Amino acid sequence: MGIVRVTDGEPRESKRRDGRALLIKGARQLLAEKGYAGMELRDVAERGKAPRGSIYHHFPGGKRQLAVEATRAEGKEIGALIERSLEQRGLRGTLGLFGEIFRRRVVDHPERIGCPVAAAALARPEDPELAAAATESFRSWEEPIAAALLGEGVSRADAETFAGLVVSTVEGALIRARAAGSTDPLDSAVGGLAQALDRLLEATR
């Protein structure tokens, strides 16, 4: 049996990945709080507990690259939650999941009421690359919902329309929740979507 050697580079590589992940996490928080224009690199470095210069080490493209990757990370994380929820809780339960995700932000971190993906979307037309990352993320949330509706016998056109309605309604409710400092708009939005889902499924039977 050969000897397995752990090289000095492996711990450094792990530390590098951890540092990069912390910066992305900080960028996601700041996008939600302040939007892209208000996201300062010094604040990202502070959130990530990293020297400001390390941002350019991990993200040579600077603020834009960091924001794009933070947007994609948010999209990927929520997309994975949606897919898992659809498997475990079904369509109605997944509508509730949207409310739960953002309700926690309103309650636990009022200063972070917002969605990094929505903040990135507002960058168009000044930054089409960032807006494209937001569009990609929104689509990754809509597609599994539409697929689940297709599995229930809903037509493709109606499934895609309803999936888009879910994302648009929740994002709009999040803006209202931020203005009100309350979860009520989210609760109302999720309740309304649940009723619309019931009507849609009933119409296919």
Regions found by a protein language model. Give the residues of each.
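Short, basic, alpha-helical segments at the C-terminal edge of helix-turn-helix-like DNA-binding modules
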Residues: T71-E77
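N-terminal intrinsically disordered/low-complexity leader segments
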Residues: M1-D18, A203-R205
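Hydrophobic alpha-helical connector segments
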Residues: I82-G114, F162-V166
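Amphipathic alpha-helical packing segments from all-alpha helical-bundle domains
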Residues: G79, R112, D127-E152, T161-G164, ...
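Helix-turn-helix
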Residues: L22, G26-E69
